[in-house]
From Swiss-Prot:
Subcellular location(s) of the protein: Cell outer membrane
Example GO biological process: protein secretion
Regions that span the bilayer: none
Name the record gives this protein: Type IV pilus biogenesis and competence protein PilQ
Segment forming the signal sequence: 1-24
Length: 769
């Protein structure tokens, strides 16, 4: 029974193929891109009519095989390998009746197909663990769709479920295009997929498979996902595929030297999705691909090398393809060109002995498909023996041998002696110039929006507003330019071609200037420590001599006739300089008293000062901000034998002066001047006067947008030890400490200056403090 059912289903595939067109064209290209949820899209391109494929899935090994009836393969590379967790390799093969694509997977998978224009999109994702249901029940439960219905609906999706395990033994014994038993469902309808499933299908397939949304619905999910993918095609071109779900507009594309910058306006990229791909090893014009966030926009930067040209396509909303091709040889260029040439024509072999040059040109025209027109001046014979040489290189060799050159217009190539072509070019240019000199003059007003009209005076090299003449290369000898500063308008009078050049120039230059927010942080930290130890002591007394009384001692004035009074004055006076805690001892003795005082001090200080000036300015425009004091100083001037006194104001400010310069690759070069001045007290002789403590920085540095750079710093450390003592007495061990004063001081100061520039968006950003 199962064998009969297998034959019936195989017959249905044959019937389906019979209803399709006898010749459906060739497969010309295969591209792979990524979707969220670990999905892949394989895009198969055709040169003619599209055929919806039939196929089957195996789990061991994990493969998806798709057959395209009455289809050939027209690709230089028929085996494509990928370093991907799901898809590892795509192999293409053909026989007389069909073409087959085999998708080798790293793990079991499932797929859906969809026809879009001249392409078939194959959506691949991982299969659930419970998908491997028995093959026989799946065959019985799957109703076969009529062949006519399949052929008449090329734009519908077809779903293929898991068939019998395709063992390696069966694979080796089977012919290259032997069909396996598959379960074919009805044409795919996302709205009716669950309702149309039978009870047996629900038992064989898990609930997850029924609830799975098709790839198209997943692509339209509201969650914004952005991803990039890179690959190389058969033309040595680098292909970058950008998937930006949720972005419905068109990207802004600009070219700056060796960079292609693609900007998605108002499409925010999460920080975790920023990435950079180094693809230089692929040997394409693309060297590096960077996806990053720029304010509220997403920016794709393609770094290139060599000569290239860009082709961009939009496959669907949110999906963009950028193809960077090596630039082909320009056949229209004439004259001497020492640059290395690249030849891409079909290889041919020629072996002639003493043959007319015209005959050789005729053969090359047939081989290349070009229409070659030779001048009457082209004549002579030559011997030529070439094997497996591109036809365009053979043509170049013939022209070099006979001093010939060519000019191409469409599919027609004119070949003549080089001098003859140069004379024609010169005559043509002279005729165009004569026509321009005799043409009518027109007047056009250009009111500038963002630039100052005076800036165009220097661009056009106009000394005054009504200057005429041909000193400027943009203006013809009969033209003139007037400038109206009141209305910011340029009035151009010249031929139509010159006015059109002015229009293009103004469109390129009259654009809003980028703005930069520059933020500086000045951090000043100080750490101080000091310790002092001092001593002072003295003695006083009174002694009676006969009938007289004489006073003696340290600390009182000696005299005669004094009373029995006691007093004390320190004669060893070595205290600490600062006010501090002290211990004083007085000891009375029979004839006087001793006084001893010990003083000690220790201090620890830590300070931190933060200054944060910031300023907003346009690109290449200087900005300045200051905050502080103006301190008056008295200045005495002496002249002609007399003197005069004046009062001058000196600034003590915290200031930031900066001029930013944005480079084409988004870096910022800044010329920075930072001042941090403050009033201070300075010693001048025996006086203390007012002075200004200054800290200045002048530098030029480059930093990336949003990056922070330390542009300067100063570190100071002062260490001091002082010792004051009484000679000789201070040197006595132990007791000598009573005749000493010690001091220790350590001060550390550090100044660091940070600077952070940020390029503001065109709409402007609010300042945040």
């Amino acid at each position: 029974m199962n064998t009969k059912l297998t034959k019936i289903i195989s017959g249905l595939f044959v019937a389906t193929a019979a209803f399709q067109t006898a010749s459906a064209g060739n497969i010309t290209d295969i591209k792979v891109s990524s979707l969220p949820n670990k999905q892949k899209i394989v895009k198969v391109s055709f040169d003619k009519e599209i055929v919806n494929p039939t196929g089957f899935v195996t789990s061991s090994p994990a493969r998806i095989a798709l057959d395209f009836e009455q289809t050939g393969i027209s690709m230089d590379q028929q085996v494509l390998e990928y370093a991907d967790p799901l898809l590892s390799k795509i192999s293409a093969a053909q026989n007389s009746s069909r073409a087959r694509l085999v998708l080798n997977l790293n793990k079991p998978g499932q797929y859906n197909t969809e026809v879009r224009g001249n392409k078939v999109w194959i959506f691949i994702n991982e299969s659930d663990d419970t998908v491997s249901a028995p093959a026989r029940p799946a065959v019985k439960a799957a109703p076969a769709a009529p062949a006519k219905q399949q052929a008449a609906a090329p734009s519908t999706k077809s779903a293929v479920s898991v068939s019998e395990p395709f063992t390696p033994a069966k694979q080796q014994a089977a012919a290259p295009f032997t069909e396996s038993v598959v379960s074919v469902s009805a044409p795919f309808s996302p709205a009716k997929q669950q309702a149309a499933a039978s009870a047996k299908q629900q038992a064989a397939a898990p609930a997850k498979q029924q609830a799975a949304a098709p790839a198209k619905q997943q692509a339209a999910a509201p969650a914004k996902q952005t991803n990039i993918d890179f690959r190389k095609d058969g033309k040595n071109a680098g292909i970058i595929e950008l998937a930006a779900l949720g972005f419905a507009g068109q990207p802004d594309i600009s070219q700056q030297h060796d960079h292609i910058i693609v900007t998605l306006k108002n499409h925010t990229l999460p920080t975790t999705l920023q990435r950079s791909l180094d693809v230089a090893d692929f040997k394409t014009p693309v060297q590096k691909v960077t996806l990053k966030r720029l304010n509220n926009d997403t920016q794709l930067i393609i770094t290139t090398a060599g000569n290239w040209e860009l082709v961009n396509k939009s496959a669907a909303p949110g999906y963009f393809t950028f193809q960077v091709l090596p630039k082909k040889q320009n056949l229209e260029s004439g004259g001497v060109n020492n640059a290395p040439k690249t030849f891409t024509g079909r290889k041919i072999s020629l072996d002639f002995q003493d043959v007319e040059i015209r005959t050789i040109l005729q053969i090359l025209a047939k081989e290349s498909g070009m229409n070659i027109v030779a001048s009457d001046s082209v004549n002579g014979k030559m011997t030529l023996s070439l094997k497996d040489v591109p036809w365009d290189q053979a043509l170049d060799l013939v022209m070099q041998a006979r001093n010939l050159d060519m000019r191409q217009q469409g599919n027609i190539v004119n070949i003549a002696p080089r001098d003859e072509l140069l004379a024609k070019d010169k005559a043509l240019l002279q005729a165009e110039k004569d026509i321009a000199d005799l043409g009518a003059l027109y007047s056009q007003n250009f009111q500038l929006k963002y630039k100052n009209v005076e800036e165009f005076r220097s661009i056009l090299r106009l000394d005054n507003a009504d200057t005429t003449g041909n000193r400027n290369t943009l203006i013809s000898g009969r033209g003139s330019v007037l400038i109206d500063p009141a209305t910011n308008t340029l009035i151009v009078t010249d031929t139509r071609s010159v006015i059109e050049k002015f229009r293009k120039l103004i469109d390129e230059l009259d654009v809003p200037a980028q703005q930069v927010m520059i933020e500086a942080r000045i951090v000043e930290a100080a750490d101080g420590f000091s310790r002092d130890l001092g001593v002072k002591f003295g003695a006083t007394g009174k002694k009676k001599l006969k009938n007289d009384t004489s006073a003696f001692g340290w600390g009182v004035n000696s005299g005669f006739g004094g009373d029995d009074k006691w007093g004390a004055e320190t004669k060893i006076n070595l205290p600490i300089t600062a006010a501090a805690n002290s211990i004083s001892l007085v000891r009375a003795i029979s004839s006087g008293a001793l006084n001893l005082e010990l003083s000690a001090s220790e201090s620890l200080s830590k300070t931190k000062t933060l200054a944060n000036p910031r300023v907003l300015t346009q690109n290449r425009k200087e900005a300045k901000i200051e905050s502080g004091y103006e301190i008056p100083f008295t200045v005495t001037s002496i002249a002609n034998g007399g003197s005069s006194t004046n009062t001058e104001l000196k600034k003590a400010v915290l200031g930031l002066t900066v001029t930013p310069n944005i480079t084409p690759d988004g870096q910022i070069i800044m010329t920075v001047k930072i001042n941090k001045d403050s009033p201070a007290q300075c010693a001048s002789g025996n006086q203390t006067i007012l002075c200004i403590s200054t800290k200045n920085l002048n530098t030029q540095a480059m930093v990336e947008n949003g990056g922070t750079l330390i542009v300067g710093g100063i570190y100071e450390e002062d260490n001091g030890n002082t010792l004051t003592k009484v000679p000789l007495l201070g040197d006595i061990p132990v007791i000598g400490n009573l005749f000493k004063t010690r001091g220790k001081k350590t001060d550390r100061r550090e100044l660091l200056i940070f600077i952070t520039p940020r390029i503001m968006g065109t709409a402007g950003n609010s300042l945040r403090y």
